Structures are given as C-alpha cells and as structure tokens.
C-alpha cells in the first residue's frame, strides 16, 4: 500500500524518496504560510455564508487555523517534506487540531486556485513593501538634492564632460526614476491582487461559492472572469519581476556613479565607513564593495525574470507543475530588491560630496561651449554656423591649453566680430546653470519646483 497522501486514494506504490525530495516545495513555499492561512479563513467563512458549512464548522476551522498560525510564528510547527507543500502541511495540522471538520476546508477548492490565491497575496504584500522602500529612497534623494541644489558638477554624455549641472538636479534624476518604479508597482498590484478562488482545478465548481466575498475579506481588487485564466497564468509574477529588475537597473546605474566618483581621479564623493570595506593586503584601500555587490546582484534579478519567462513560455492550458518554479525566483528577487533599496537609502544618507573637486572639474572639457554657441545665436547667427564658430574657439583654446573664458577678447573677435566683452559673463558655469529655468531644467527654480512636486507626492 502507498503511504497515506491526501491525494493518494488511487495510488498503490509509495512515492520514491528521491522523487519526494525532488518535487517537494515546502522548503521554500512555507514563506506563504500567512497568506495561505488568511485565504483559508476567508474561504471557510464564505463556505458558511453560502450554506456549504455550518457556522459552527467554519468557526472551528478558523479557530484551528489561528492555532496553526500561532505554532508557525512561535517556532513550534513541524514542517514535513512528505506533505509536499505549505498547503498540505497546514491542512494536515489543522485536521490534527480540530478533527474531521478540518477535512471540509478544501470543499470547492483545488490546490490550483489555492496556490494562485496565496502567491498573488504574497507577491502583492511584497511589492507593496518595495513601493514603501522606493518612496523612502526618493525621500532621501530629494533631501540630498535640496542640500546640493547649488552645488555644480560636470554633466556628462558618453562619459565625457558636456554641460554644467547642479548636483541636486543630478540626484533628482534618480528620484524621478524611482518614483516611476513606485508607480509601476502600484499599477502591478492592481493586476496582482485579484481573487482566483472559485476556479478550482480549472473549470470552476458546482458549489455555490462567492469569490467576491473572499476578495472583499482579503482586501483584493476583484475576481477573475475566466477559471482557466485564473489558475494557468503567472503574468503577475513576470510583471513583478520586471518591476524588480527595473528598480535594480536604476540602482545599478547609481552604484556605477558612486563607484566612479569615489575613485581619486574624480574624488567627487567620500564613502561612509559603514558602507565600504578594506583590502586584505593594501592598508590604504577603501573599496566601494557595497555598491559593487549591488551592481552585481542586478544580474541576479535579471536572471530571475529570464528564468520565469522561460518557465512559462510553452505551457499548455491549464495548470502544470512547472509553475511550482515561480516561487524561488520571486523569493530571491524579493530579498535582493528589498535589501538593495534599504541599503542604498542608508548609503546615500551618509555619502559625503566633495564640492571643491566638483567645482574644479568644471574647468576641464569646455562645458561652457554650448553657452558660447547660444550667445552667438543671440547675436543673430544661425545655430549651425554658431556651432562651427564655437568649435573653432574650442580648438584654439585646446591648442593653447586654456579654457574658453581664458581666451582674450581679441582672439574671440577674430573668430566672430559679433562677440563682445559681455561673453565672459555668459561663460560662467553658475550663470549657465541659472539660465536653464525651463521646466525640467537644471536651474535653481526648476530644481525647487521638482522638489516641491516630489514632496507633495511623498505626502500622499
């Protein structure tokens, strides 16, 4: 005879030990215990409301589930791999505690819609947590941006000096990226937190269930219109993993800049001791290991998304056991994204900015060349011609190893006789930044407007 499984009525042989270990998921899906119990309590109450269970039966089941929850959170619950997953472990212990009435809990329900519910709730809970952490990081970025609204540094394209910008404006670029990440998560949550109960295995059920009642009990946005869709798709996992991957892409870019700026060749930032490490052989080293590891972990999250896309790409309708492989990629992504957002916020709070080095760097790379071109346009010269004339001025300054503003007026007028001595005020980096007051620009008023808008969003 086969060992007693909850599904074992038609089996005569026991599951091979190696197969049991290979197919079990309780080693990782136990993370869903709170959602599984919450879903089962809502299901039991709904069964009583619909007359499938008596009120007393539902009450006993709910009480038993609360006892199971207490055991799990108290560390006394015994997880059994031979029971395969979190659902069977909880149901088995429930039946031990309340007797045969516990066996009625699964009425009108399959593990197919049960796991879909549990995982939707779990993913929703976690991406809501990510959203909170993303908002916290936006707040830190906005705070540091406000402190450095008037600190200037070279803005780059192609990793080459381009135009002067304020450090505040630079930091706010990341704040806006992360705000969009938070908004994406809120949008993803609306599609994730939808109740699949009532779908059963795939075709629905003959019991008079009320999925909308369960959805209301669990603070969900609604129910499914198609039972096969409800149990067969994991697009909510894909979408959440994409959101996580996008967050990590943004964090990785910020890490890259911190790493570069910490190099003495730049010297723009001073790493806090709490977010750096040393060398086992070189006593002078202060390495940006935290930023490097975060940059490296980005690939790990990308891998989770790729793994999940590959898992679901060729599945026939409806539920397939392949879907068990949706948990570990998300769980790993969750740990990585959550920790990375929190650590980045802490690192940025303590990161030191070397304003002197940033200011000195403004002298290299002719960052004010565009100002000269715009100045010439203001003198009535077409932009393309102004661009060409400015290029000639840059070439002359480069040949003499001086800056544009160090070129004598006579040399500038030899290039274009419309240049007057008012050009030197235009070439000042601070003036260049101050003139860019259009919405979204790097000017002080624009930065202040950005900060005000982000502050309002953070207070919502």
Curated annotation (Swiss-Prot):
Pfam families: ASL_C2, Lyase_1. GO terms for cellular component: cytosol. It is an enzyme of class 4 (lyase). The keyword RNA-binding does not apply. It comes from the Bacteria. It is found in: Cytoplasm. Keywords: Amino-acid biosynthesis, Arginine biosynthesis, Cytoplasm, Lyase. Its EC number is 4.3.2.1. GO terms for biological process: arginine biosynthetic process via ornithine; L-arginine biosynthetic process. Gene3D superfamilies: Fumarase/aspartase (C-terminal domain), Fumarase/aspartase (Central domain), Fumarase/aspartase (N-terminal domain). Belongs to the lyase 1 family. Argininosuccinate lyase subfamily. This is Argininosuccinate lyase. It comes from Nitratidesulfovibrio vulgaris (strain DSM 19637 / Miyazaki F).
């Amino acid at each position: 005879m086969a060992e007693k499984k909850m599904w074992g009525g038609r089996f005569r042989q026991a599951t091979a030990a190696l197969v049991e270990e290979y197919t079990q998921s309780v080693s990782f899906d136990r993370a869903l215990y709170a959602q599984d119990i919450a879903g089962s309590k809502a299901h039991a109450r709904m069964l009583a409301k619909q007359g499938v269970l008596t009120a007393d039966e539902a009450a006993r089941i709910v009480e038993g589930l609360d006892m199971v929850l207490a055991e799990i959170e108290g560390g006394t619950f015994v997880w059994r791999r031979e029971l395969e997953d979190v659902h069977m472990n909880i149901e088995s212990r429930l039946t031990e505690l309340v007797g045969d009435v516990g066996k009625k809990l699964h009425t009108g329900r399959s593990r197919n819609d049960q796991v879909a519910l549990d995982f939707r709730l779990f993913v929703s809970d976690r991406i809501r947590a990510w959203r909170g952490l993303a908002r916290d990081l936006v707040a830190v970025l906005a705070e540091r941006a406000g402190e450095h609204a008037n600190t200037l540094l070279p803005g780059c394209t192609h990793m080459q000096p381009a135009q002067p910008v304020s450090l505040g404006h630079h930091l706010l670029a990341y704040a806006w990226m992360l705000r969009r990440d938070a908004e994406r998560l809120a949008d993803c949550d609306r599609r994730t937190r939808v109740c699949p109960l009532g779908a059963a295995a795939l075709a629905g059920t003959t019991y008079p269930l009320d999925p909308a009642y369960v959805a209301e009990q669990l603070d969900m946005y609604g129910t499914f219109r198609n039972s096969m869709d409800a149990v067969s798709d994991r697009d909510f996992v894909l979408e959440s993993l994409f959101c996580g991957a996008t967050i990590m892409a943004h964090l990785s870019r910020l890490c890259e800049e911190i790493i570069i700026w910490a190099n003495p060749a730049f010297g723009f930032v001073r790493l806090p001791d709490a977010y750096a490490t040393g060398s086992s052989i070189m006593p002078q080293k202060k390495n940006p290991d935290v930023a490097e590891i975060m940059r490296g972990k980005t690939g790990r999250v990308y891998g989770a998304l790729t793994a999940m896309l590959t898992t679901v790409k060729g599945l026939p309708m409806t539920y397939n056991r392949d879907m068990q492989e949706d948990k570990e990629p998300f769980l790993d992504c969750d740990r990585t994204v959550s920790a990375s957002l929190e650590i980045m916020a802490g690192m940025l709070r303590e990161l030191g900015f070397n304003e002197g080095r940033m200011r000195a760097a403004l002298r290299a790379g002719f960052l004010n060349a565009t100002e000269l071109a715009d100045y010439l346009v203001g003198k009535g010269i077409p932009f393309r011609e102004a661009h060409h004339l400015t290029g000639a001025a840059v070439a002359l300054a480069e040949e003499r190893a001086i800056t544009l503003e160090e070129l004598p007026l006579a040399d500038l007028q030899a290039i274009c006789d419309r240049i007057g001595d008012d050009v030197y005020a235009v070439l000042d980096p601070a003036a260049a930044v101050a003139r860019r007051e259009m919405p979204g620009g790097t000017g002080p008023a624009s930065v202040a407007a950005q900060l005000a808008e982000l502050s309002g969003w953070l207070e919502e």
